[in-house]
Amino acid sequence: MLPYTGGSPHQRHAILAINLAGGGGFEIWQYTSRVPQPAAFSLELGDFGIFCTRMKSRDVKASYEYLKSQKASLLTPLVKDPGGADTFYLQDPYGNIFQVVKGTDWFGEGKQLTGGPAGCLIGVSNMEKSMRFYKEILGYDTVVYDQTAVFSDMKGIPGADKKARRVLLKHSKPRQGAFSRLLGSSEIELVQVIDKEPRHIFKDRFWGDLGFIHLCYDINNMKALEEKCKAAGHPFTVDSSNSFDMGEAAGHFSYVEDPDGTLIEFVETHKIPVLKKIGWYLHLQKRDASKPLPDWMLKALRFNRVK
C-alpha cells in the first residue's frame, strides 16, 4: 500500500467486524504510527469517493424509531428514496454517513434489526464512465433508478441542496462463492453533482485516514480478474502476489481505482479459521470456488469472536 501511504509503511490497529445476520463486513482501523487525518474541508454530496455506506435493515421504519430513541445523530427523517423505498441517513461520532435501506436477503436472525453493509454511495465526475466501470468490472448491470434533480429525501445531508444525478445499480444475477450466502446482495449508488465542482475526499491524505478508505470484494480467480481489469483500462495498482499470510488467515489481495481514483480492493481468500481453539482451518483453494460454504460452517465463525 506504499503508493497510498506516502511511500512509507505504517503501523495500525485493525478490527474485522461482521454481522452474522448477513451483509458485508467492516475493517475498522486506526493508525498507531501517525495521527489519522480528517479531510481539510467539509465533505459534501458528490465529492469524489465513498461518501456513504448503505446498511441493510429488516424494518427501516422500526430502525429509524430505535435509533431516534437512542439519540443517534440522524441527518434526515424517515423518507422515500427515488425508487419509492423507505430510507434515512445518520452519521457516526466521526462524521461518517450511513444510509439505512431495506434488506432483501438475510443469512441469520441476529439480535438487531440491522445487518451489515449492503453497498455504498460514491461520488463520480462522469456518470457514463463510472457506470461502465461498475458494470464491466464489478457486475452491477441493472439500473434501479436514474434521476436528476435537487433531491428532497437527502435534505439535511451536506451538499444535498445542489442539483445532482443519482443512479442506483444492482446485480441481475445472484452472487456466487464461498461467502455469498453471508455477504448477500449489494447496491451501488453513483452521484454526479451538476451545480458545483466536487473535490476528492482523500485529496492530500493517506489510505487509512478518517473516512471510508476503500470498497472490498470477495472474489475468485485473481489472475482472470487482473486480465479483465487491464483490458478495461483499470490495471491493478497494488498486488500482494500469490498468497499473503495474515497469521490465522491467508489470501491474495489487489487494488484498482475507479475512474475518479476511488479504491476498490479484491480479496481471494485462501485460508480462514473455523475453530481456532482446536486448530481447524478451512483451505478454500481445495474446494469448488463457486459453491457457498455450508451455513453451519459460516455460523461457526461466531466462535472466533474477540471480545
Residues of each region from the PLM?
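C-terminal functional regions that serve as terminal interaction/effector modules
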Residues: 170, 175-176, 182-194, 207, ...
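Generic structural signal for well-ordered beta-strand positions
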Residues: 96-98, 143, 264
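Vicinal oxygen chelate
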Residues: 6-33, 37-66, 86-90, 116-126, ...
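A short, acidic/glycine-rich surface segment
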Residues: 1, 35-40, 105-108, 150-155, ...
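Short, structured interface segments
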Residues: 27-31, 85-110
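Core segments of cupin and vicinal oxygen chelate
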Residues: 1-23, 69, 79-81, 123-185, ...
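A common structural junction motif
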Residues: 70-75, 141, 232-237
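N-terminal beta-strand motif that seeds the catalytic metal site of vicinal oxygen chelate
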Residues: 48-55, 101-131, 137-154, 158, ...
